[in-house]
Each structure stands twice: as C-alpha cells, then as structure tokens.
C-alpha cells in the first residue's frame, strides 16, 4: 500500500474524518506531483503534512468534547452487561476513542431521557477506572417503580442518552485525613467506588479506609469482585458486608447497619478522621443518628475538605 493509500485508510477510519478530509486532499495532491521525480521527497512531504493534519485535529478535542457542565450531549450505548439480578453496567461511547473523562472524586453526572414526551433527569456516578479512554460506564439498578431505571433496562445498543456534568460538592484533601470510614447501601456504592479508585492505588495516599456495604441479599452486592480484589491488594483498605436477607451459606453480618457495627468496623471520631455516607435516604438518616451517638458532628453537605461527615 502506498503512503497516499495508507493516509486515506487511516483518516477515513478515525474520528476526525469530517475534519480531516479537506486537509487530506492537500496531503494527497502534493506527493502525487513529486512521485516520478523524487521518491524520497514524497514520503517526507506526506508525513509532515499528515502530522500537522492529525495534530490539528487532536487539538480540536478541547472544543468538541463529550461532557459539558452547562449543556447536554447525547452519547450512544455501545455495550450492556448484566452484573446482578436487577443491575446492569452500561457503556456509552465517547466522541473520540482516546478521550478521557476528568471527573472529580465523588462527583456525578446528570442524565436526561425522554419518556412519553416528558424529559426526565436523574443523577448517576460513573464507575470508570481512572484514565479509561473512549467510553463512559454507569451502573444502574432497576427498581420496580423506577421510571428511568426501567427505561435504562430496555435500552438498545446505539440508542442515545443525554449527559451533562460533572456535578458535585465533595472536595477531598489527602492531607486532612489519616482514616476514612465509609457506609454505602445498594447502588450507593457507585460514587464510593469512584472514591476508592482515586485514593487506594495512589502511592502518595496511605489513608486507612474501612467500608461497610449493606444490601438486601447477597446477590445484590455490586462490584463485589472489585472490592474484594482491592481489599486483598491493598492492606490499608477493609470491606465489611451486611446482608438483610441472607441465604443459608452467608456467614457475615445480618440485618441493617447497626451502631455496634459502626463502632466495630469504622474509625472513631477524631480530628484527622472522616466519615462518608451514601445510600437510600432512610439508611442515611439512621446512620447519621448513629454517627451523632458516636460523637461525629454531622449535617455537612458542602464538602469543603474540612467536613468530618459528608453525605452523598
């Protein structure tokens, strides 16, 4: 294949095709002019012009990205994976295959869908591993009376959903906490997972983290393999599961999160300790009351980095 054919093939199959077409014509015409006289010059001219062409297109990502705080962008569903009896992992394709989403820890996205002519907005936290390229991943649990979650459950590949963000208030400073206690319930694990992925692998951040993760049944535990892998790989992270309706083989904690479990598994209230809570409203309210009894000051939602307790 000639250098010209290679350029045409490469550009026509990459995300900048519409942008590059005009510049490619100039790249093609020039080497054809020199083909019979200076074969070496053909390659030099082609490569130089192609580098300029592609670099210019690469810079254009900054002005045409997949997420904005102040406007909606539609992205297509590219993959859907069932991860539990009522929960799926949804993968949406970004505009560019090597685009990375820079979503601050603990932040979420606004998601908009149209159902029966009505636009509905919900908020979800991406579960992308840091530096993931080309796609956005969401974990969505389908609820019996959840209009939007049931809409997600019926999504087809290449169907579009609108996104806006990132949005949020949590600000984490690794210098403010030596120990971090986290209580998550159900799908509330998704923003927590984002926090864990940011802190735990960092060699500069050795904050000790203890997580209590509560669910209705063992089958409802989301991302369990990931959590167990983190706990095995990083000794400064511990995870404890609580199941409301266990099966016969379950040998962990049973029921709802209790005051005693918080005392047993989570760090005590201290100046350099923090507590994060993310779950259903009733669970959050109950856990906040327990936190009061344990000496934590609560009711914080600002997330300015000095709050002792933060509720997602």
From Swiss-Prot:
Which residue intervals are topologically Cytoplasmic? 36-41, 201-312
Q: Which organism is it from?
A: Saccharomyces cerevisiae (strain ATCC 204508 / S288c) (Baker's yeast)
Cross-referenced InterPro entries: CBR-like, Cbr1-like_FAD-bd_dom, FAD-bd_FR_type, Flavoprot_Pyr_Nucl_cyt_Rdtase, FNR_nucleotide-bd, OxRdtase_FAD/NAD-bd, Riboflavin_synthase-like_b-brl
Pfam families from the xrefs?
A: FAD_binding_6, NAD_binding_1
Q: Which cofactor does it need?
A: FAD
- The protein in question is named Uncharacterized oxidoreductase AIM33
The membrane-spanning stretches of this chain are 15-35, 42-62, 180-200
> What's the family?
Belongs to the flavoprotein pyridine nucleotide cytochrome reductase family.
Enzyme class comes to oxidoreductase
What cellular component GO annotations does this protein have? membrane
Those parts of the protein on the Extracellular side are 1-14, 63-179
E.C. no: 1.-.-.-
**Membrane topology term:** Multi-pass membrane protein
Q: From which domain of life does this come?
A: Eukaryota
Give the disruption phenotype, in one or two sentences. Increases frequency of mitochondrial genome loss.
